[in-house]
Amino acid sequence: MKIAIVCYPTFGGSGVVATELGLELAKRGHEIHFITYSQPVRLALLNPNVHNHEVHVPEYPLFHYQPYELALSSKLVDMVKLYKIDVLHVHYAIPHAYAGYMAKQMLADEGIHIPMVTTLHGTDITLVGNHPFYKPAVSFSINKSDVVTSVSQSLKDDTYRLFDIKNEIDVIPNFIELNKDKLKENIPCHRSLMAPDNEKIITHISNFRKVKRIDDIVRIFFEIQKEVPSKLMMVGEGPEKEGAEQLCEQLGIQNKVIFFGNSNEIDKILCFSDLFLLPSETESFGLAAL
C-alpha cells in the first residue's frame, strides 16, 4: 500500500509513534509518505520506501497567523494525486484531521475517493481539542474520519465523554521497538559521567508543558536529595523549562540538576537512571515511561 502519514515532526509522543509506525510499515514493504512542516526528528535515514514531503506556508503580510491548515490540505491533495496514495493516516486531531477531511473533499470533487484514519493521542482531545474555539471542528472531523483509533482506553472514554462522537473508536496502544533496544544492550553505560557511584540519578523526560507538573518534579527531587545523595536529569524542551530552572536556583539545587534539552539518545540517558519520575496531571498513554 501507499500510505500518507501526517504528524507533528517534534519530540512529542504523537510524532515519535507516527514516525516509528511509518518506519515499521516500510520494513513490511509499504510505501510511506510523511507529510509535515519539517523532517520528523525520529526519521534519521530515508530509504526507498520512506519519503518526506515538507509543507511550506508562504509568508504574506495580510495574515496575522499563516494558514498552515490550508497549505497542508493542498499538499495532501497534490501528494495523493502524484503518488497514487491509498490511505491517509493523520496523527493528532488538531489540525490534521480537519485538514485531512478538507483534502478528502477536494479529491472527491475530482472523482478520487481516499479513506482517512485518525489517531487520537491525548491533549488533542483532553486539553486543546476541548477548548470551545476548537471543539466543533474537532468533533466534526473525527466523525468524518473513516477509521478512528486512540492510544488508550482512557482516551477513548474521554473522547466519548467530551465530544458528540458517532464513530466507533478502536484502541491501539502505543509501542516501542524491542529489537532496536536489544541491539543497544551491549552499548556501555557510562554512568560515572553523570554522577559518582554513591549518588542516585533521578530522571524526567517530557515536553515540559504544564500538564507534566514540572515544578512538582523539582520539589520532589528537593525532598529526595535531602535524604539521599542524588542528581536530577531533566530531558526535553517546553514552556515550563525556564520556570523549572529558576525554581532550582531558588531552592539552591541548581548544581544537582542537569537540563539536557531534547535528545534522540533516550536509551543512553535511561541506562544511567535509578528512578524515573512522571507525575503528570493526566496521561493518555505516557510513552516516555514505556
What does each model-identified segment do?
Residues 196-203, 214-259:
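A conserved nucleotide-sugar
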Residues 61-88, 97-102, 132-136, 140, ...:
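An amphipathic, basic-hydrophobic alpha-helix
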Residues 108-117, 123-141, 157:
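Nucleotide-sugar donor phosphate/pyrophosphate-binding loop at the beta->alpha transition
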Residues 262, 281:
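Aromatic "clamp/platform" in nucleotide-sugar-dependent glycosyltransferases that forms part
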Residues 154, 175:
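Carbohydrate-associated surface elements
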Residues 264-273:
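Short acidic alpha-helix that forms the nucleotide-activated donor recognition element
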Residues 181-196:
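A short helix/loop element that forms part of the nucleotide-sugar donor recognition site in Leloir-type
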Residues 7-11, 23-68:
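N-terminal strand-loop element at the rim of the active site
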